[in-house]
Amino acid sequence: MANTGAAKRIIEPLDPNRHDRAAFFCGIIQVDNFFKKTANKLSKADNLRVYVMTEDDGTTVIGFYAINSHSISYADLPERFSRTRPGHGSIPAAYISMIGRDQRYRGGGYGGDLLTDCLQRIAGIADQIGIAVVLLDVLVCGDEEKTSRRVALYSEYGFQPLPSMPLRMFLPIATIRSLMG
């Protein structure tokens, strides 16, 4: 998980009093609405945590991601991953519930930096509590080409589609650890 070349930026928890959510615009209605209207509420309710990458001014948001705990039935994973799991119930997972980058920063490698930071943060959490996989749902915005590009991007990071739900992707925590070296 090498740095994608963008200048190193600080990624920190969302502070609604300091981080300018109103100016954020990624161009995808679901992502923009989530960040502007929902992210802080869900964070305050302890449903998820939001992390933002900012400009040097500490207020201009370049991008963000939101994570929370989740679980997945062992039966939903491909056989080679589920064979070491219990024969019943669910296994612990981390869920990337949303990730977005402001359009003004397109092409700077910031999206990759956000995803890398997210996966590193989850790996750190997995050192303290049990997490077997990371899950995410590929955003469907009505444009098949954009959806395909998102699938390809996540695949480059090692995510694989679940057999029963191809737009839900997973990445074993062991893979993240091996990539981090």
Swiss-Prot record:
Instruction: Report if keyword Lipid metabolism is assigned.
Output: no
Q: Provide this UniProt record's keywords sorted from A to Z.
A: Acyltransferase, Plasmid, Toxin-antitoxin system, Transferase
Q: Which SUPFAM superfamilies match?
A: Acyl-CoA N-acyltransferases (Nat)
Question: Which GO MF term does the entry hold, naming one?
Answer: acyltransferase activity
Keyword Ribonucleoprotein assigned: no
- Outline the subunit composition: Forms a complex with cognate antitoxin TacA.
Its function? Probable toxin component of a type II toxin-antitoxin (TA) system. Might acetylate tRNA and inhibit translation. Should be neutralized by cognate antitoxin TacA (y4aR).
Sequence similarity: Belongs to the acetyltransferase family.
Can you name this protein?
Probable toxin TacT
The organism that produces this protein has a lineage beginning with:
Bacteria, Pseudomonadati, Pseudomonadota, Alphaproteobacteria, Hyphomicrobiales
